[in-house]
Amino acid sequence: MNLRIYAALLFWIGVVAVSCNRDDISFETPASGLRFSADTVFCDTVYNQVRSESYAFKVYNDADQDVVIPNIKLGRGAGSLYRINVDGKSGTEFTNVPLRGKDSMYVFVEIAPTASGPEAIATDKVHFTTGSGVDNVTLFSVVQDAEFFVETTGNPNILSGTHTWNNDKAKIIFGDLTLASGSTLNIESGTKVYFFKNSGMTVQSGATVNVNGDLNAEVVIRGDRNDPYYDTIPKNWNSMQFENGSLLNMNYARVFGGTRGLDFREASATIQNTIIHTFEEYGIHAVNSTITASNLVMNNCQFANFGIFKGGTYDLTHCTLTNQWRPVAAPALIAGNEWINSQGQTETGALNLNIKNSILHSIAANAVIFAPISGQTFSYLMRNCLITHDSNGAGFDITGNPAVVAPTVNEDPSFMNTLISKMNLRVNTDSPAKNKGNTADAATVPLDLVKISRTANPTLGAYQ
């Protein structure tokens, strides 16, 4: 009896072993075409000689029977800028690739391009040969030529003297880039500045950065990942830090996606026609600094869009500061006399803050939070501003406050679109911000962010 059981067990083990031998499975060439999850794969914009991240599409066998795909190859063969990975193997051409009935497989794609000009298009096709002919999936990517600034042990990555960055090449910063004391960096219109993860820039005392963008030719400062997904998430890079006595002149820039955007330590700045959004901490972090801003748009920062510490002097005219950060709502602007330095010591300074013809909005109860201390100057004026306000926790009252002139309180500004992926902070025609501006203040900034005149019936915020 035991011998019979043993013999039967050996028989079934043999059957299973034979049935699991892949070489004995019957695969046929597909009689009909395969199905694909996409007919075109759009890869991230990539930089000259930098390998992209991997992208994928799926190949489906909708038939009941198992099939073998006779040939899968890149159209440009070994000369292609792309590489594909099929069934765990990387290359440019594959033969006799099996695919079971009612099953699918991934094909992974990456590109390691070369570029001979500022921007080029790289295309290829993945050809799938079947019994019914050849199916194709198109591969598409934009390739940018790039100049690299890489910090290493032997290269501290310091710029000295006067430098000008043009839009002929993207600027890629790996590690920290330092602009030496007394030096000047000019960043011209249309230039794109990309920071790798955990990278940033330090502008030393007495150094100057001039950002000279223009409408439709803005200077872009962001993380190095160009996929649209990364446009909406923070902490892809660190910050641009301006040390004591340094200077920033910024016009028409888009700064987004880092930990802190512009970090000022007793520095000076003039910021015009600029959009700053999506930062892990602050879009602007200012310690006892002097900042003049107009047509400034800010949104989506976890601690606050604009953080002011240890006082300073600030003048904001026709700015749109809304904070749509989720899940924990945060203010648009916070200001105080104190700052805790890196040694844990508390430093204090006098504050002078003027905000005119602006939108100060948040999904939190208070768009503006003040933290004055006794014994220090805390001077402010908010004139003709739309403001989200709750006296609890704001640090100031609006009713009967001579420093708050002609406010529009707790009304929805009616933005066109607050989604970060589609952000448009123009206001609709029925917005309570329409025609609410002080004309004398509007005359100091006569054109809005898109160069529309606002000298008559000025709208609050950066857009007329």
Which residue ranges define each predicted feature?
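Short, solvent-exposed loop/linker segments at beta-strand-coil boundaries, enriched for Pro/Gly
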Residues: 73-93
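Asparagine-centered strand-capping/turn motif at beta-strand->loop junctions
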Residues: 59-63
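Short linear motifs in exposed loops
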Residues: 108, 455-457
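Contiguous beta-strand segments of beta-sheet-rich domains
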Residues: 69-74, 120-124
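Bacterial N-terminal signal peptides that target proteins for export
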Residues: 1-9
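C-terminal motif of bacterial Sec signal peptides marking the signal peptidase cleavage site
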Residues: 16-19
